[in-house]
Amino acid sequence: MPLLEPSATAYGTFGDMRPDTEDEGERLLTDGYVSDDDGSAVTSVDSVQEGVRKIEAINITWTTRSLVIAYISIFLMAFCTSLEGQTIMSLSAYATSAFSKHSLISTVLVVQNVVNAVIKPPMAKIADVFGRFEAFCVSILIYVLGYIQMAASTNVQTYASAQIFYAAGSTGLQILQQVFIADSSSLLNRALLALLPELPFLVTVWIGPTIADVVLENSSWRWGYGMWSIILPASFLPLALSLLLNQRKAKRLNLIKERPHHRRGFVAAVRRTWYDLDIFGLALLSAAVTLILVPLTLAANTKNGWKSNSIVAMIVIGVVCLILLPFWETSKKLAPKPLLSLHLLKQRTALAGCCLAFFYFMAFYFSVQPYLYSYLQVVQGYDVATAGRVTQTFAFTSTIAAFGVSILIKYTRRYRVYVTLGCVIYMTGLLLMLLYRKEGSSPLQVLGTQVIVGMGGGLLNVPVQLGVQASASHQEVAAATAMFLTSMEMGGAVGAAISGAVWTHNIPRKLNLYLPDEYKSEAGAIFGKLTKALSYEMGTPVRSAINRSYQETMNKLLVLALLATLPLIPLSLLMSNYKLDKMSESSDHDDASPRNGLGPGERAKRT
């Protein structure tokens, strides 16, 4: 089956997308849709949200040419976002140096992780409520505003707030790209197509720093940020036109019927939007995650530490919000269309997949981000370029592994075996890290462990997402994808916060313990500035004390990473081993096998 074929079974109520079929109305009726007496207008049952109705109607109108154009645009957008990500890594140091204030940046990075976690569900809701085209436009707008604000920022506070806008826009694009791929592809092809946004990284990881150097030599870091506010919208144009033109085509064919509530007044529209987007649920989720995780990084730098009234108050309020969240989200009266489709977690496959993503990414933030780069420079003595390449090895190898496993899934029609295999390799790589990430280890040993962990991550990530999507109905495909990606980002946010707390608590204490007496007063400066730590020659008592402090702290993080991966293999075995070529996306109860496209009631084959 070709990767892009309009007649392919897609994620939705429509089993086949044939725009020229004469009996279109009859086919749609058999698929559970309601038609006018003349058979011309098609609407879904009232429970299906407007954005889902739009994309299902658009799916009928796709031609091979328009679908190829849409996917080319997805690739262009992914290439742009990947390239800018690699470019601004080199620009951020110059930007923060221009403000002569670095203390706020570490906290902003944690807030970015929180934004990445909480923005996916509301963006998925916007896609379901208003439409895919509208949601893409919102993400692009937020993204562009973030970059304009960064380019024009005159102080670190403005720069920090701009980073939050940027995080919201970029992570919104991430979820929407995956939702679009799920909308327009069959399960067998989805694993391969879902990798499309990741493929540019194989190239951009090497050329991004070069572009940053050219920008800095010929212009300024401000233009390095501002130019993406022009480039990204341009890359979105082909997809925007494809979605907009096919949506208009569907309206001309009378496949999208306006509902009566669309003609109601402003108050009714606001009330419906409040419930559709679950505004209060979003506020609870954001407050819970932010107020619990951010204090973990602030406590070490606060005067009274964990005894500070502000730290305690934030954590208490965050915990209260976290306790209230499931009650709110499961109340049909308060949240008739909840932000988090927690009932999806009643399905074993979805629950296991989301938990697996959480622990997998938590372990990543213990072992690779955010302190491996500093560790390699200080303890291993690597230069900037070498440390950067070793750190980037994980993403490079995981992308290659994900591409390989996507091809295997397409031809073996199974996914769970690769999840379990990926978990085993991932855990093995972390164990080898604990054994070989030592002072004096050879570059081959350090690099080899990164390659193994990257292979494991690539093998398990794509199949797990596929399994979670396969367990959901089309009305909930965006919600299921958002739940999976949110679980992953939540794991990353928790991992980043805990690793930050471990690092900030242990390094200063160990420096005060191991540094020669005459250098103990330098402990704060050594901890606060990487350049200060690197200024001492290898082999001197001071550098040996610094290296020992870094090494012992890194060992603690690696032990935490191993502990975080203990549930991975059992969770992988809890996921249903769907036979992907025998199923379509329809799941009505706990682990019910989605039905295939051959007829109602026919079960997918599972083992």
Swiss-Prot record:
It is a multi-pass membrane protein. InterPro entries: MFS (IPR011701), MFS_dom (IPR020846), MFS_trans_sf (IPR036259). It comes from the Eukaryota. Pfam families: MFS_1. The keyword Membrane applies. Residues 584-593 have a biased composition (Basic and acidic residues). Disulfide bonds: none annotated. Its main location: membrane. Residues 584-607 are annotated as: Disordered. GO terms for molecular function: siderophore-iron transmembrane transporter activity. It is found in: Membrane. Keywords: Ion transport, Iron, Iron transport, Membrane, Transmembrane, Transmembrane helix, Transport. The chain crosses the membrane at residues 67-89, 129-148, 186-208, 223-245, 279-301, 311-328, 349-368, 388-410, 417-436, 446-468, 481-503, 557-574. GO terms for biological process: cellular response to iron ion starvation; transmembrane transport. The keyword Secreted does not apply. SUPFAM superfamilies: MFS general substrate transporter. GO terms for cellular component: plasma membrane. Belongs to the major facilitator superfamily. PANTHER family: MAJOR FACILITATOR SUPERFAMILY (PTHR23501), SIDEROPHORE IRON TRANSPORTER 2 (PTHR23501:SF87). This is Siderophore iron transporter mirC. It comes from Emericella nidulans (strain FGSC A4 / ATCC 38163 / CBS 112.46 / NRRL 194 / M139) (Aspergillus nidulans).
